[in-house]
């Protein structure tokens, strides 16, 4: 009888686990219809308007053509292209200066929004009626496209210009995790008090920034979001174009939120190799940890920020007084995480300190979910 009871109990547990487990699919981005490709929803808004476009190499239509080329073929009057970190063609490395200039293919003036000029000026916006924003985000607070979007929205609000955000899949949109940024640690790699992984598409994020009045002085812009079609939030999306030079595939995008924490240490993350953000290297020990297989094995289970790698690296390099650099606090957004890691706290102990902030954020996030 006891064996039967235990067997029945095991079946109940198994069923419960299967019900609660999230089926995380790996999909091609083409399985969702991007906002850019839903031209019937926004082309009428551009008729007889002077248009500026915020775009880069990821701003492609579902048929593979570039947004700017497509709009020009439809007769849209694009007078200026604004481009973020990595440049209009997406070839500049992280942190590399992005110069303004003229696009060789179209002859349209390109204005860089990375470097000293992160926010469009009134002069640069003069004569523009509508700003069309179309960048592929990866759902991570320190990925700077959402910061560029914030400055674009702010400049638009100050100059009476409408903003249309063309939504795209968030390849890390299936979870929310990480410490919520403290106001005193705001920077271009973290402008808002949200967790590291915030679980919103870039269109939803724009709505949150506007709705919560996070622009300077609480101003709001005239914002329209063109939603995705056939979007599944509970999926990893294989993007057709890499969003930036060092995120070449879905594995790097999936691992990026966790591995980017190493950018605030003296541990390498594979920049300049064939596996950027898929490995980490401890040069002092001449050791490299390859996580490509991890991404494939655990993508259905590890729907969280993984701290075990940085905790392990710190333990192995416990005598390295320069393990952390000053950039670490900017990345993580909180002042005490470095101390917690140095003191030997476990991942669970550290994670528990985030929960109240995450719970409060989830209440805000819920108001802006489209999908």
Q: Can you annotate each of these PLM segments?
A:
Residues 31-76:
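N-terminal phosphate-binding or glycine-rich loops at protein starts, especially the Walker A/P-loop
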Residues 90-95, 164-186:
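Glycine-rich, charge-decorated loop segments at or immediately adjacent to ligand/cofactor-binding or catalytic sites
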Residues 276, 281-355:
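Conserved functional hotspot residues or short segments at active or partner-binding sites
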Residues 98-128:
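Glycine-rich oxoanion-binding loops at beta->alpha junctions
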Residues 1-25:
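Bacterial Sec-dependent N-terminal signal peptides
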Residues 186-258:
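Conserved anion/nucleotide-ligand pocket segment
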Residues 137-149:
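Glycine/threonine-rich flexible loop motifs
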Residues 79-86, 166:
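Short internal beta-strands
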